[in-house]
Amino acid sequence: MSFNSVLFIAELPLLLTALTAIAVMLSIAWQRNHKQVFYITVIGLNAALFSLLPASSATPVTVTPLLIVDSYSVFYSALILIGSLATVTLARAWLKKFPDNREEFYLLLSLASTGAMVMAQAHHLAAIFIGVELMSLPLFGLVGYAFRQRRSLEAAVKYMVLSASATAFLLFGIALIYAQVGSLDIATIGAQISRLPQAESAHITLLIVGLGMVVIGFGFKLSLVPFHLWTPDVYQGAPAPVTTYLATVSKIAVFAVLLRLFYTIPATDSFFYSLLGGLAFISIIIGNLLALLQSNLKRLLGFSSTAHFGYLLVALIACRLGSLSQEAVALYLVMYLLTSVGSFGVVSLMSSPYQERDADELPAYRGLFWRRPILTSAMTIMFLSLAGIPMTLGFIGKFYILAVGIQFHLWWLTGAVVFGSAVGLYYYLRVISILYLKTPGMPSRDATNDWALTTGGFMVLTSAILVVLLGIYPQPLLDLLPLAQLATP
């Protein structure tokens, strides 16, 4: 078999991510050294990120019957690697004083990132399942990494049990699709469905049931209503850096799969897309209303995440109607990645594994501006962006989602987005106001002078700067959005 340089370049990012996990494993076996393992992970993930550049210039390459490397997979792989690198930088500060083994954290994270990249490249249901499991299994260990804390162990058990249930739905849905179509290749499934006689209602019904079960499986990963019940407890119990990963990388990978799946497979029945619309509607409304009631920052951001992916479902429903919807998804996910990394990054920088819990209760942030003004400014920018305030990237993202809803006459969903944004504005501004309240006897400063020079501090500040700069001048990001478009099936 001859060496194929095109295939090698196309798969180099995935190979480097997998090799990073192997290198970390060998380093742990040879000698436990937290600093060394951290640098191996950072170098490996950065190498994988930069290796995406030559892969993006190539035409779509079908590497195996399971994986395809195109501009779409390259774009979402870049988001996955950026989110993984952000988690690593936050984890280093959090793990410095961790009383138990620290190196395995980077091994589990590298394995989960490998699974997420497999999902971004998958165009076969078997590859999707492999990617989901390769990402999910390490996350069980990461969620329960602070195993001496009861909340962390409880969160890990809940996530494991409910994730196994979601996997069962996903597998059963894949089995029903295969039984009706006779293939697991996404493109073949789309072609076969388009040729099915509409008169064969039994075939269409079973296909809808199969696709519905796939949506249930992915709905759990995206914490959509009514599959969101795990989110507040797991977000609250998991270590702060792991919560960052759960909220960003794992959800971006799943949504990339959903978009490819429903763009390739034609609409089989209007009822199915009405069902997706219903999921979007209740996720937006209930997610925002539940966030309104929270006094814990992690739980608030967890329910807020449910609402944000409800907004994204609006664009997903219209994905076959025009390129604007795909651009809206890509832009909104970039915004969501930067703002979530920044907001959870602040929680991570405020937390310590020696504490009984992370610094996630809102009273812990009362008057934070008078103690840590720069950190508070970064957090304020993140929440203003999540609320969709002008001059931030969040405003551009919300504008694109509303434009999709209006252009394709999704009026009831557009109304839900407007209502959800209004409710979100209230609870985001409530958190911001708490940051600036001053109480008598409060110390003027309690932060070290060099916190912003640490890797985690630098990452939070960089995210805040990008959110503002891209909110004022989004053209560089808009120029990249065509990369995130799928080819017409």
From Swiss-Prot:
NCBIfam families: NDH_I_N, PRK05777.1-1. GO terms for molecular function: NADH dehydrogenase (ubiquinone) activity; NADH:ubiquinone reductase (non-electrogenic) activity; quinone binding. It catalyses: a quinone + NADH + 5 H(+)(in) = a quinol + NAD(+) + 4 H(+)(out). The chain crosses the membrane at residues 6-26, 37-57, 66-86, 105-125, 127-147, 159-179, 204-224, 239-259, 271-291, 299-319, 329-349, 377-397, 408-430, 452-472. NDH-1 shuttles electrons from NADH, via FMN and iron-sulfur (Fe-S) centers, to quinones in the respiratory chain. The immediate electron acceptor for the enzyme in this species is believed to be ubiquinone. Couples the redox reaction to proton translocation (for every two electrons transferred, four hydrogen ions are translocated across the cytoplasmic membrane), and thus conserves the redox energy in a proton gradient. Its main location: membrane. InterPro entries: NADH-Q_OxRdtase_suN/2 (IPR010096), ND/Mrp_TM (IPR001750). It is found in: Cell inner membrane. It comes from the Bacteria. Keywords: Cell inner membrane, Cell membrane, Membrane, NAD, Quinone, Translocase, Transmembrane, Transmembrane helix, Transport, Ubiquinone. GO terms for biological process: ATP synthesis coupled electron transport. NDH-1 is composed of 14 different subunits. Subunits NuoA, H, J, K, L, M, N constitute the membrane sector of the complex. It holds the Pfam family Proton_antipo_M. Its EC number is 7.1.1.-. It is a multi-pass membrane protein. It is an enzyme of class 7 (translocase). The lineage of its organism: Bacteria, Pseudomonadati, Pseudomonadota, Gammaproteobacteria, Aeromonadales. Belongs to the complex I subunit 2 family. One of its GO terms (cellular component) is plasma membrane. This is NADH-quinone oxidoreductase subunit N.
